[in-house]
Amino acid sequence: MPRKTKQVKITSPEKMANINKSNLRLKDDFLLYLRSVQRSEGTISGYDSDLNIVFTYILDELGNKDFQKLTKRDLIAFQNWLVTNGMSSARIRRLKSAISSLSNYCESILSDDDPDFKDYRSIVRKIENPPLNPVREKTVWADEELEGLLDKLTEQKEYEKACYVALAMYGGRRKAELCRFKVSDFTDDKVVCSGALYKSAPILTKGNKYLECYTLKKKFDPYLNNWMQYRSENGIQSEWLFPKAGDPSQHIEISTLNSWANTFSRITGRDWYAHSLRHYFVSALSRAGIPDSIVVQIIGWSSSEMFKIYDDNPKDDRIAMYFSNGDIDISKVKTMENI
């Protein structure tokens, strides 16, 4: 099911009406700037929500002062307030990131042109973040669990849902990215690596980056074919692999995928969320013997540090892949064609 995040219950329409108008104008200018540099609407919406929390805190606790007059002591007090109210370290880092991004905008854009921001310098980076601590039990899937889910969905003729699960399993993309695949991303001319992978056209991903996304063809094809046959038989025409119900000119909505996640959780009896399949995909590639550096390229990470976060294979199991019968053995290492 969609995982629950503790929310900061601080904003309200009444409080928003009383927030310092200069701060609200600053926020609007910042969001306009983000649109001008083509940040995604999801990213902009996140900044909007987070900054509303920040400005409401300033209203309640800091005398509704101008944003540019915040001190390091103010930021420490805000961080402590978040900790005291039970926010996760990841959530605190996100809120501080919103403050940091707005501060950078003030420093790089406004400090030269606006007298109110003359000589402004960002101070957020001087405040140490709380250590990252997991707040949820991570769902680690065995092959047979997810294959059982695919079998059940196929048996129920839920071909679109099965195709979605298979794409997440064998492509490892984030939930928002899974919405953005098109039918044309899975045609013969998109097959690469000796027939082992589909390589999509560039898709908008986190951080406003466009990446070519890879999917394991042999594993994914049965569920893709079932869904495309169902679409053909039922007159479903859309460029999107998963079209929006009632408006096939648009891709499926996140709210629909969240509802599906509840269904998958009931079927599996475990907490099903799309991001757990990103871990599954990375772990499966590693388990198959694909070098870490190649996995990093497949996912599109800029750093190998992310691999360590997403690889759920026990350390001893990874080491054991290269040894057998009392000696080094690399014969078990597979290529893409073998996965």
Where are the language model's segments positioned?
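C-terminal secondary-structure termini that scaffold catalytic or DNA-interacting sites
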Residues: 1-14, 325-339
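N-terminal core-binding DNA-recognition domain of tyrosine recombinases/integrases
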Residues: 28-136
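Short, charged phosphate-coordinating catalytic segments
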Residues: 109-112, 168-194, 293-294
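Basic, Lys/Arg- and aromatic-enriched nucleic-acid-binding interface segment
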Residues: 143-175
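Conserved tyrosine-mediated DNA breakage-rejoining catalytic core shared by Y-recombinases
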Residues: 180-222
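Active-site/catalytic core of tyrosine-dependent DNA strand-transfer enzymes
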Residues: 216-270
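Short, basic (Lys/Arg/His-rich) helix/loop patches that form interaction surfaces
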Residues: 237, 258-297, 301, 316
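Catalytic-site neighborhood detector that most strongly recognizes the C-terminal catalytic loop/helix
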Residues: 299-325
